[in-house]
Amino acid sequence: IVGGKDAPVGKYPYQVSLRLSGSHRCGASILDNNNVLTAAHCVDGLSNLNRLKVHVGTNYLSESGDVYDVEDAVVNKNYDDFLLRNDVALVHLTNPIKFNDLVQPIKLSTNDEDLESNPCTLTGWGSTRLGGNTPNALQEIELIVHPQKQCERDQWRVIDSHICTLTKRGEGACHGDSGGPLVANGAQIGIVSFGSPCALGEPDVYTRVSSFVSWINANLKK
């Protein structure tokens, strides 16, 4: 995240760090004891899921927090890695997540029609500037949901199943934020998908969660 600040410990108990061979790869969010939500491009093509771990309950990449093994990753079968559509995936955990003060699920938004031009919150461990380092501390930033019609004009790939944010140059998502949660009113409205790296005053684009709630529910590990 560019232009954010260190998040208070425990404020975002749904935040996940997906780490591949120990290095932060993507954000994700806790849906329930067995399932974590992320972007398809974070897990698509990973041959060895044994090297992918789900870290929860910590704000710091220098700490492991609570670590969970991955049983399976389900990528939306309509995911298009060129058009960046249907960029959504579920990570099934081998053992159930234990909830506590620092580890809690987030609910999914089913109705986001009134969100345009309203505030939302992005969290992640993405770079704090283009080409910059990964921050150790989880970052938070308040953004604004960009009007959909404007976003479709600004970013040619954008369709109805995307949702966008834009505030100003110097604020936004960056590499390593992918797969992480965009939240409004206590519900997740987006999954970080793509943008014009980083924070150049163009909209950031997210998978619109409400468009995929039925897919998510159908593909959860029960």
Curated annotation (Swiss-Prot):
Cysteines engaged in disulfide bonds, as pairs: 26-42, 151-164, 174-198
GO cellular component, one term: extracellular region
Coiled-coil zones: none
Occurrences of domain Peptidase S1 (ranges): 1-221
Enzyme class name: hydrolase
Pfam families given in the database record: Trypsin
GO MF entry, a single one: serine-type endopeptidase activity
UniProt keyword annotations, A-Z: Disulfide bond, Hydrolase, Protease, Secreted, Serine protease
GO biological process, one term: proteolysis
Protein family (similarity comment): Belongs to the peptidase S1 family.
EC number(s) from the headed UniProt entry: 3.4.21.1
Membrane-spanning parts: none
Organism: Solenopsis invicta (Red imported fire ant)
Catalysed reactions, as listed in the record: Preferential cleavage: Tyr-|-Xaa, Trp-|-Xaa, Phe-|-Xaa, Leu-|-Xaa
SUPFAM superfamilies reported in the protein's UniProt record: Trypsin-like serine proteases (SSF50494)
Subcellular location: Secreted, Extracellular space
Name of the protein: Chymotrypsin-1
Record-annotated active site: 41, 87, 178
